[in-house]
Amino acid sequence: MKIDGYTRMAAVVANPIKHSLSPFIHNLAFDLTDENGVYLAWEVESKKLAAIVENVRNLDMYGLNISMPYKGEIIKFMDELSPAAELIGAVNTVVNHSGKIIGHNTDGIGFFNSLKKYDFKIENKQMLVLGGGGAAIALIAQAALSGAKKIVVAARKSASYDPLNEKLAKLSAKTGVEIFLTDLSGADRLQKELNQTDLLVNATSVGMDGASFPLEKSLLLPDRLLVVDAIYKVRETPFLRWAKEQGAQTENGLGMLIGQAAESFYLWTGKEMPVDKITLEMEREV
């Protein structure tokens, strides 16, 4: 890596963040594309966010990636939001557009871009998502923006269930796409929806331990189904093994991780990230 007077910076901002794989991904991408840039990890307190964003402008940085817990809080410091970021209510990518600071969310578009190798497009298709956290909302919003026919969200009954239902109703009203919530423990209803589903996604952390399972194992999967687990630190979760045993195409969360990074990289540099080469390196790293 060459560092000189022309080198531009990007960084990921969160707390904690020193464990992040983002510097590995982006610095490798800078090298492979001959882009004179460097990517760092900044672990900062909430009170420093305004100054960090101002540094993007003052230091002519490419921009930032934003991770938890700041994806929502960073919004108030943006000059403008992309349609996806506005709909999701979270920013994971900050772009310096000639001094104008624009907040984007690349989680959803990165996820669906990672499925192109299966010739899969969400337009006019049905998706079933397990979980209703931040990752799930990003995928749901992007699916709606991309013309999904129907989106079913399955979550366990808890204190967050009714607020999630309200959030999904608002997303549905804003996009005109049918989005509804169902109880994850309702096996009969889930089976009915699965029979019509084209894409099944686990957007929970269940399975991160390599043993736990997010839904009833008695459920039967349709032949044409594509099944994705957002978890990437476990190469093949029990959920993916179960789906593969039923004949489904399966994908772990590494594609989503690299896909969202690739979209950020493009927004900053105008260059395509060499995803295939970086995926090979990441498979050795993870």
Swiss-Prot record:
Involved in the biosynthesis of the chorismate, which leads to the biosynthesis of aromatic amino acids. Catalyzes the reversible NADPH linked reduction of 3-dehydroshikimate (DHSA) to yield shikimate (SA). InterPro entries: Aminoacid_DH-like_N_sf, NAD(P)-bd_dom_sf, SDH_C, Shikimate_DH, Shikimate_DH-bd_N, Shikimate_DH_fam. It holds the Pfam family Shikimate_dh_N. Pathway: Metabolic intermediate biosynthesis; chorismate biosynthesis; chorismate from D-erythrose 4-phosphate and phosphoenolpyruvate: step 4/7. It comes from Lactococcus lactis subsp. cremoris (strain SK11). GO terms for molecular function: NADP binding; shikimate 3-dehydrogenase (NADP+) activity. Gene3D superfamilies: Leucine Dehydrogenase, chain A, domain 1 (3.40.50.10860), NAD(P)-binding Rossmann-like Domain (3.40.50.720). Its EC number is 1.1.1.25. Shikimate binds at S20, L21, S22, S67, N92, D107, Y232. Belongs to the shikimate dehydrogenase family. This is Shikimate dehydrogenase (NADP(+)). Homodimer. It catalyses: shikimate + NADP(+) = 3-dehydroshikimate + NADPH + H(+). Keywords: Amino-acid biosynthesis, Aromatic amino acid biosynthesis, NADP, Oxidoreductase. NADP(+) binds at G131, G132, G133, G134, A135, A230, G253. The gene is aroE.
